[in-house]
């Protein structure tokens, strides 16, 4: 069976040496999965997880009134069917959204006063309309008001706790000050920081700081609890006159012995005085059974009591907790006969006194005072009461409605502080706060590490779903307030849920988010790559993110954790550099929002095929080998030591210590960068430009996939959604330019399935960037297609591969100065062959409104215009399709009523001759703007419901209806044929149980005889279920089932199409005051011309400087002229050598193509062609494929390859120098890749050999036609009366200060006077000039420029009385 060449990836020779381990995940899954998790559409209401919309509803509901006598509870939500489909939304300027209904329950309670209990009085449940919610299209975009938009994912700081220091910059002493910050997902921030005196302070929400112990006391901790939590204590006792302390090994480490420590039994000195207690010494003491050691009084002086020291006899407090012990105190303790007491262990080396010092400066004693102090700091001016202070403090950190750490925040907090708090505890706990402070104090004491906020374990991605979830919550909270008010104002028992709920605030928030949020962007639809990249973009900007001005270098920089997650290359140039990034090819986002990348697991020095995804935190500490580390056939590493990544550094690691290995070399770059062959030979700055410029390539009329690609082209084209992909396996039944019909294979659907797929192709639609979207079939009738095969190419795709530019023959040499400084010299051949011609589609819209003076009308009857002007308008006043239009031509005729004004004599005369009509309307027709010249390719008319339709509308509707009816008939025909085929298999050859008569009584099927196909077809299909089969009851059942299904399907199809036609004929929803809206589409063909910008894929860009006749171009020995001449000096300083390697490999690919063409022309035997192809490909799978081909199929393949054999040189594992030379050899070229060129003008050979080859060159969106602009007369600024600036405003050219100096330097006084007066802002002079020119006089009288009047007014506004005195000469 014929398979289409389009879907054979083997035809591209691949240089990759590493076998593909896993497929690249779908490129737009980041968008689709996020929104899927948000809506949970395919999950039944009761099984929905607590995430997305469900989570928002459950967190805001139930809503109770203030007295808690009623509550509104959430049950479930459901989405309806969108009113318009995607296509209709595009055309009508609507939003593709589904209506949402929420089922809520209103419960009313009776409150019994006596034993304060509640009993349910009433429960009402109801579905309430809750506004519309935009749906995502198949391709991961949203259609808002008729335009496609993308919600860019945001990269923001993850919630959790972060430790940092100021690098010694805050205080003049250069002391390093540590700080901690607890950031929740929503709620108040909590900051702890040390000052230069080592006092610990706390800030809530970045307000004024206060001692940290105020907060800790507010949590209910007393001074002694705090001291004993943060400090260890030592026990000291008296033994006669001596002081002793208990030898606690943990505390003794690193202390010094004050006196000799002697074994009392043997007298052996275990530790000498002034020596440190080492681990060995402590062990020795334990062996000798020493439990306590002598200390001197000096050592105890200045120590701090860890508890109150109380005289047991009298109960008198001798020393308070946190009091320093003096000689007097110690004597008193001893005198009172207290045997032991405890002091805090503070040595100011390993344990500092910062927390104790903080307690000392903190004058607040009780919890209540602490709460009131916090209230005063947060609400200055409010009179504090204990109740309000407690409520405020509880709400700050412990109320789930006000404070939410989120699962991620809790995870990070537990991870950093080593806590075991369950993940569903989303608020702070007292334990959290203590541990945060403890870690901060440890950090100051030299334990623990600070966090790197640019580490991808500390930054997470908020994709569409989560961003919308946050907006939805805001809307619901606004709605909640309104509901509470309504509940308290009205009698609840008389109300239904819908009386309480007004979904306007929610709809408004959603609408605002999609319409005007910084992250909701107009989709970049220039070409398929730009679409995919836009959907995979990560932005650090946006609400809750960074701002360009405040972002420093660190945030923008590449970080080791970006490896395999975020592309180090692709980012914009300019102020956003580093703030906007792109997801790497294999990366995905996990449920916590962290970016993960896949690795192969390594076990005992052997690589397995098992692949696991790791986030940046999970991979920490693992040794990870590169994808190109050499392994043998068993997967064992060849070398003993392997270069690997570990904790952000490259280290040499023994093979047995390796734990992970990259899955592919291109894992670390993004989609756009992975499309650049020989990326490894380009400088990073140029690679950045290359990946950005590929996104600006305009789709060309004739797409041409690159001869030298990377193998990613097919993936991008498939996932971008611009090409049409088969939904099932099947055979192509019919193909034309606008649709493909595929009959599905039998094993693909069950017996009752339909068995037909109809694909309607998009023809010449306009993209967001005015480029042309057009789909072309690549399959023939009878081709067999497999699921997910490409059956039609979209814009910039060729045979299912991305094709952004053209393969052209380039030579690197200077040529007459025309390629100086990145200019490009091109051959006229490229223009003649339409190689770089692109189609651009402009949309023009004209609206007829109902004005105060009467209705506007769209008509061909326009006053004061000749026949010639109106020749292309039809009777409805709309231009005909196919008309060639130029600037100034009328597209849509429209007249607007005008108020009665004083008539001029001419108008009076016209009125007298033609009656009323000509006078009371003015011509407001839509005309073609300057710079647009093209062909009208379509018109759409939208008219108000109930308005009369004009002839053109009826014509358009009729054509649409015919198209729909044809689809309907085809679908029914194929389903019917398929069903008949199945029924024939069942019935033909079976024995009839009864005879079957036609309507005329003629016997069509004889009883007891086998049914023939002829006899069967003489019976109408609808009555086949009446045929009864002998000996087999199942056949009758199956026949009835198939016919039943057939009729059911036909009914469904008819219903669907009738509905579409009904919609077509219905009037349109137009904005208020609009009677009719007409859109006209003009296709503009842009050929390549001087001034257009072109670029390669390696950041090598330039502007076309001259188009040379092909006979003047330098030519090869066989007479072929080159097509583009580039300057060789553009390569060395820019260090993008990849373009040269691409040129060489392209030359080889082309040469091999010429060899194949030569064989075909000479009618070489099949075997010879096969052998040559096998030699070129050198690949077992390809050999197998070639051997399986029949003669005709082989010829088709060879014909396809004679343009050149496509090569894939994947990123970081591309063709080596040796590989390129080998290919050049097979093509019959010299291995240098250089040839002798001849001058096209003289025919003389150039002195040196020149590098010639095939380079893939793109035409970028910066077209000179869009930029060139000229003006004679036009609009003026209101205040200054000077011409406006810019093409969009049809402005003039600015003659600035420097230009005036130049004119002065040349002494061109009169020209300059004209420039500054009559040609600019001298209003009276302009008019005089016009009159003079009309009357044929050429005198110039400049007057006073308007800007002078502006200057005078400005001076007057400063209070200076300036007036202009005119000197009247007698």
UniProtKB/Swiss-Prot annotation:
- Chemical reaction(s) catalysed: RNA(n) + a ribonucleoside 5'-triphosphate = RNA(n+1) + diphosphate
EC number(s) recorded for this UniProt protein: 2.7.7.6
UniProt keyword annotations, A-Z: DNA-directed RNA polymerase, Nucleotidyltransferase, Transcription, Transferase
GO process annotations (BP): DNA-templated transcription
Keyword tRNA processing listed? The answer is no
Q: Which InterPro entries match?
A: DNA-dir_RNA_pol_bsu_ext_1_sf, DNA-dir_RNA_pol_bsu_external_1, DNA-dir_RNA_pol_su2, DNA-dir_RNAP_su2_dom, DNA-dir_RNAP_su2_hyb_sf, RNA_pol_bsu_bac, RNA_pol_bsu_CS, RNA_pol_bsu_protrusion
GO cellular component labels: DNA-directed RNA polymerase complex
A Pfam match: RNA_pol_Rpb2_3
Output the Gene Ontology terms for molecular function. DNA binding; DNA-directed RNA polymerase activity; ribonucleoside binding
Keyword Nucleotidyltransferase among UniProt keywords: yes
What this chain does, per the entry, is described as: DNA-dependent RNA polymerase catalyzes the transcription of DNA into RNA using the four ribonucleoside triphosphates as substrates.
Q: Name the family.
A: Belongs to the RNA polymerase beta chain family.
- What's this protein's name? DNA-directed RNA polymerase subunit beta
Source organism per UniProt: Geotalea uraniireducens (strain Rf4)
Q: What is the lineage of its organism?
A: Bacteria, Pseudomonadati, Thermodesulfobacteriota, Desulfuromonadia, Geobacterales
Protein's gene? rpoB
């Amino acid at each position: 069976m014929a398979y289409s060449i389009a879907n054979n990836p083997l035809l591209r020779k691949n240089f990759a040496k590493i076998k593909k381990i896993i497929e690249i995940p779908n490129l737009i899954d980041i968008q689709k999965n996020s929104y899927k998790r948000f809506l949970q559409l395919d999950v039944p209401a009761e099984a929905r997880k607590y995430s997305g919309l469900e989570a928002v509803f459950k967190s805001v509901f139930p809503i109770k009134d203030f007295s808690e006598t009623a509550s509104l509870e959430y049950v479930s939500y459901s989405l309806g069917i969108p009113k318009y489909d995607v296509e209709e939304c595009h055309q009508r300027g609507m939003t593709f959204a589904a209506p949402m209904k929420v089922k809520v329950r209103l419960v009313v309670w009776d409150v019994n006063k006596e034993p304060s209990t509640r009993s349910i009085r009433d429960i009402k449940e109801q579905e309430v309309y809750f506004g519309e919610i935009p749906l995502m299209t198949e391709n991961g975009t949203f259609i808002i008001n008729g335009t496609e938009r993308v919600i860019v994912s945001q990269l923001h700081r993850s919630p959790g706790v972060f430790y940092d220091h100021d690098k010694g910059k805050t205080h003049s002493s250069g002391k390093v000050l540590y700080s901690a910050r607890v950031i929740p997902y929503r709620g108040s921030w909590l900051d702890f920081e040390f000052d230069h005196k080592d006092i610990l302070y706390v800030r809530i929400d970045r307000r004024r700081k206060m001692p940290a112990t105020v907060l800790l006391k507010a949590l209910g901790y007393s001074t002694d609890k705090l001291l004993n939590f943060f400090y260890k204590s030592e026990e000291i006792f008296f033994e006669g006159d001596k002081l002793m302390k208990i030898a606690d090994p943990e505390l003794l480490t690193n202390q010094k012995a004050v006196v000799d420590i002697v074994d009392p039994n043997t007298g052996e000195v275990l530790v000498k005085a002034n020596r440190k207690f080492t681990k060995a010494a402590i062990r020795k003491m334990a062996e000798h059974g020493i439990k306590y050691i002598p200390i001197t009084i000096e050592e105890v002086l200045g120590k701090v009591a860890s508890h109150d020291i109380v005289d047991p006899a009298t109960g008198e407090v001798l020393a308070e907790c946190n009091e320093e012990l003096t000689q007097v105190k110690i004597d008193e303790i001893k005198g009172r006969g207290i045997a032991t007491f405890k002091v805090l262990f503070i040595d100011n080396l390993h344990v500092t006194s910062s927390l104790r010092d903080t307690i000392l400066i903190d004058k607040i004693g009780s919890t209540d005072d602490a709460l009131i102090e916090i209230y005063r700091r947060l609400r200055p001016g409010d009179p504090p009461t204990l109740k309000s202070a407690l409520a405020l403090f509880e709400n700050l950190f412990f109320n789930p409605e006000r404070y939410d750490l989120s699962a991620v925040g809790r995870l990070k907090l537990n991870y950093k502080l080593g806590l075991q708090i369950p993940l569903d505890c989303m608020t702070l706990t007292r334990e959290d706060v203590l541990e945060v402070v403890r870690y901060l104090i440890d950090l100051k004491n030299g334990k623990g590490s600070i966090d790197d906020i640019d580490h991808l374990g500390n930054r997470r991605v908020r994709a569409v779903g989560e961003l919308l979830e946050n907006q939805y919550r805001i809307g619901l909270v606004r709605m909640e307030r309104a509901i509470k008010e309504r509940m308290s104002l009205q009698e609840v028992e008389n109300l239904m849920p819908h009386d309480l709920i007004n979904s306007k605030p929610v709809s408004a928030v959603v609408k605002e988010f999609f319409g005007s949020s910084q992250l909701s962007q107009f989709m970049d639809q220039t070409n398929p790559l730009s679409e995919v990249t836009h959907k995979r973009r990560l932005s650090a900007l946006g609400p809750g993110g960074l701002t360009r001005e405040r972002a420093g270098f660190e945030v923008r920089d590449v970080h080791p954790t970006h490896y395999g997650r975020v592309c180090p290359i692709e980012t914009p140039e300019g102020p956003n550099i580093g703030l906007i990034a792109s997801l790497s090819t294999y990366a995905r986002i996990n449920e916590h929002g962290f970016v993960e990348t896949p690795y192969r697991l390594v076990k005992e020095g052997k690589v397995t095929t098992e692949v696991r995804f790791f986030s940046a935190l999970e991979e920490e500490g693992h040794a990870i080998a590169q994808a190109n580390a050499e392994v043998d056939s068993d997967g064992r590493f060849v070398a003993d030591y392997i270069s690997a990544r570990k904790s952000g550094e490259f280290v040499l690691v023994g093979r047995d210590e390796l734990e992970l290995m990259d899955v592919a070399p291109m894992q670390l770059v993004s989609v756009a960068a992975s499309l650049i062959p020989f990326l490894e030979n380009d400088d990073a700055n140029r690679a950045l430009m290359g990946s950005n410029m590929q996104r600006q390539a305009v789709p060309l009329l004739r797409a041409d996939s690159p001869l030298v690609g990377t193998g990613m082209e097919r993936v991008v084209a498939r996932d971008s959604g611009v090409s049409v992909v088969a939904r099932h396996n099947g055979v192509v039944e019919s193909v034309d330019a606008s649709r493909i019909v595929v009959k599905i294979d039998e094993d693909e659907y069950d017996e009752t399935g339909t068995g037909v797929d109809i694909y309607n192709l998009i023809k010449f639609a306009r993209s967001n960037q005015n480029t042309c979207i057009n789909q072309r079939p690549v399959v023939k009738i009878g081709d067999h297609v497999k699921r997910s095969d490409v059956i039609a190419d979209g814009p910039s795709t060729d045979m299912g591969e991305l094709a952004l530019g053209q393969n052209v023959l380039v030579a690197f040499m200077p040529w007459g100065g025309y390629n100086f400084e990145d200019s490009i010299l091109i051959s006229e051949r490229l223009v003649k062959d339409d190689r770089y011609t692109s189609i651009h589609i402009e949309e023009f819209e004209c609206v007829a409104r109902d004005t105060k003076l009467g209705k506007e009308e769209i008509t061909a009857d326009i006053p004061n215009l000749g026949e010639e002007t109106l020749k292309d308008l039809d009777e409805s006043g709309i231009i005909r399709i196919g008309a060639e239009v130029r600037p100034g031509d009328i597209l849509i005729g429209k007249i607007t009523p005008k108020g009665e004004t004083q008539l001029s004599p001419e108008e009076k005369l016209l009125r007298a001759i033609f009656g009323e009509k000509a006078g009371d309307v003015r011509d407001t027709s839509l005309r073609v703007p300057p710079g647009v010249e093209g062909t009208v390719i379509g018109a759409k008319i939208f008219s108000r419901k109930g308005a009369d339709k004009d002839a053109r509308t009826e014509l358009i509707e009729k054509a649409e209806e015919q198209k729909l009816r044809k689809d309907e008939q085809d679908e029914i025909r194929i389903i019917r044929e398929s069903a008949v085929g199945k029924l024939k298999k069942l019935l033909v050859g079976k024995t009839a149980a009864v005879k079957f008569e036609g309507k005329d009584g003629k016997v069509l099927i004889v009883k007891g005889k086998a049914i023939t196909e002829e006899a069967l077809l003489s019976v109408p299909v609808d009555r086949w279920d009446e045929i009864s089969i002998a000996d087999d009851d199942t056949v009758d059942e199956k026949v009835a089932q198939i016919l039943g299904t057939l009729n059911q399907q036909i009914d469904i199809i008819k219903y669907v199409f009738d509905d579409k036609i009904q919609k077509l004929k219905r009037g349109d929803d137009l904005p208020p005051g609009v009677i009719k809206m007409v859109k006209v589409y003009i296709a503009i063909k842009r050929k390549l011309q001087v001034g257009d910008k072109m670029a390669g894929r390696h950041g090598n860009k330039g502007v076309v400087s001259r188009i040379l006749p092909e006979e003047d171009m330098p030519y090869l020995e066989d007479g072929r002229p080159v097509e583009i001449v580039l300057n060789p000096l553009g390569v060395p300083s820019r260090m993008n050598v990849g373009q040269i390697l691409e040129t060489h490999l392209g030359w080889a690919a082309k040469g091999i193509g010429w060899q194949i063409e030569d064989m075909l022309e000479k009618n070489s035997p099949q075997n010879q062609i096969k052998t040559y192809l096998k030699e070129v490909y050198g690949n077992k799978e390809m050999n197998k494929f070639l051997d399986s081909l029949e003669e005709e199929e082989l010829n088709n393949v060879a014909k396809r390859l004679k343009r050149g054999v496509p090569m894939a040189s994947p990123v970081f594992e591309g063709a080596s120098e040796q590989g390129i030379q080998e290919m050049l050899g097979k093509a019959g070229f010299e291995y240098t890749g250089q040839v002798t060129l001849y001058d096209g003008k003289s025919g003389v050979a150039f002195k040196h050999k020149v590098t010639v080859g095939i380079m893939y060159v793109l035409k970028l969106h910066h077209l000179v036609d869009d930029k060139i602009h000229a003006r004679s007369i036009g609009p003026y600024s209101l205040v200054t009366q000077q011409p406006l600036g810019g093409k969009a405003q049809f402005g003039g050219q600015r003659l600035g200060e420097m230009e005036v100096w130049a004119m002065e330097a040349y002494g061109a006084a009169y020209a300059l006077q004209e420039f500054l007066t009559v040609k600019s802002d001298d209003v009276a002079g302009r008019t005089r000039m016009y009159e003079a020119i009309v009357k044929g006089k050429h005198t110039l009288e400049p007057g006073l420029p308007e800007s002078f009047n502006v200057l005078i007014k400005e001076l007057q506004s400063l209070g200076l009385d300036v007036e202009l005195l005119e000197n009247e000469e007698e």
